[in-house]
Amino acid sequence: MVASLCACGASNDAADNAAQTEETTDAASDEATDAATDAATDEATDETADAADKAGVMPAIAKEDIKVGVIHIGDPATGSGYSYAHDQGIVGMQQTLGLSDDQIVRKLNVDDGDTTAIENAMLECVEEGCNIIFATSWGYMDTCEQLAAEYPDVIFSHATGYKSNGTNFNNYFGRIYQARYLAGIAAGMKTTTNKLGYVSAMGQENSECTGGINAFAMGAYSVNPDCEVYVKVTNSWYDPEGETQAAQALIDAGCDVIAQHCDTPNPQLAAEQAGVFGVGYNSDMSKDAPKAAITSVMWDWSAYYTQAVESVINGTWDGSNYFGGMSDGLVNIAPLADFAAEGTQEAIDEATAKIESGDWDVFDGVIETNDGSTVGTEGEHMADADITGNMNWYFKNVVVK
């Protein structure tokens, strides 16, 4: 009986052990399965996130199907100014990407102070099937913002502004101040009166214009601490007659080099007619005033337009803003004229190397202003937000007329 009881007890123990072993094995198996599932899920999630990063925020559009709109404040055919430079960028993009002429829609002479005209031009682009619309003037900004909300499948890319929505509405501009600094060197070395003139579309309330004036003045000061920059403001982005009048007033005041931040080559034409010199803007204005233009501050807008349209084609458009510089090929100066002062090229080459190294930029460190105060911090770069939106001061050698 005892033996039977013992045998029975041994059998129960074995069964219990077997059951425990099975539970342990099942638990281990379940845990391993869960871990493998979690790992696979994490990997899939990472791959999905990577794919989303690469995909951008708008769907890809086949190259043969894409249509590009561009809104100009002027007519590119009428001169070498702002609209001409932007349109040359569109042409460069078209050639690089192999788009046909009927894939480009242009709207010309759209007054950036006429909201009805602006909206009509953009809506025409939408109705003609444009997938991305480049709005090239400051005053187009609010209409871009409005229509981007109404047409979420169309990209509105606005030049020179500050608004965006991170998806189908961005802004683009560049570090044109870098090229203006180099042009200032050329002007500062050429002047004999130590009076440089500067025709500006807008005044101290506009950081884009103020930054250009300051950079030009700082470049001139770096090679000629005795020179001053006299500024005449037209209060218009496009005013051919006003630009001529402003240039003439500066010449009458004794300025012997006329720089500009305005849309037409008229200041250079006025300089040539008066027998003085100049620095053009937007494109190489030596073709307009070959006896006056020492150099020109130039844009190569194709650097941005090609990148932007290509990103729409391959589906990587991410809605980010763009602020390119010399290292991106967006801004530079035209080749120096034969009558530039001796040593100018060497001085410009030295400054160019500093800028392109990335170790130094125009608005670094502490800067003295023309009201006796200072801006900036020793050993630090000025923030892009301050360059593009908070530059309401003038460098110490600037005189506003």
Annotate the PLM regions.
Residues C8, A15-K401:
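A residue-level marker of the well-folded mature domains of exported/periplasmic proteins
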Residues M1-S11:
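Sec-dependent N-terminal signal peptides of Gram-positive bacterial secreted proteins and lipoproteins
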